[in-house]
C-alpha cells in the first residue's frame, strides 16, 4: 500500500487500484501495445485521478475541513467533513475536481506536449491529456453520485431532489443505448450500474 502526502494532504493508494488500472488499460490497449506503453497509460490514469481528487480536497480544506485522499478500484475519493456546510460550498468543492483536472490537461496539451515531442515524455503526456479530458467530462454528466449528479442534486430545491435521480436514470439509459450501438460493452455496463443506482435512490425517496 502506497502512502504519501501532497500539499500536506494524506494520500493512500490501495494495491487493487494498480491491479484494476493495469487490467483496464491492458484490455483496451490493442494487440500492438507494449509493456512500456501500458505502464505509461496506467501512470497517466494515476496522475489524472489524483489531480481530480486533489481539486476536491484542496477546496474542502480551504473551507476548514480535514481531508484525505484514497485511490482504490478504478477510481478515487476525497474524504472530508465540512464544517458549516452549505449548498454553495458543496457545489464548489464538487466542481473543483473536474475543473482542476481539465485545467491541468490543457496546460499539458498546449505547453508541455509541444516541448516533449520526440521524447519518452510524449508517451505519457498524450494519454494523460485525453484521459483527463474524458474523465472530467464523464464525471460532469448529471448521474448521481458522479460530480455532475451531485452538483445537480445540491442545486435543486429540497422538494425537487428526485429530479436529480430521474435525470440520472435517463442519462444512464442513453449511455446503455450508446454503449450497445457502438459495441462499447464496458460503457453499457457502467451506465447500467448508474441507471440502477439512481432508480434505487428514486424509489427510496
Annotate each PLM feature.
Residues 1-205:
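Hydrophobic transmembrane alpha-helices and their immediate loop junctions
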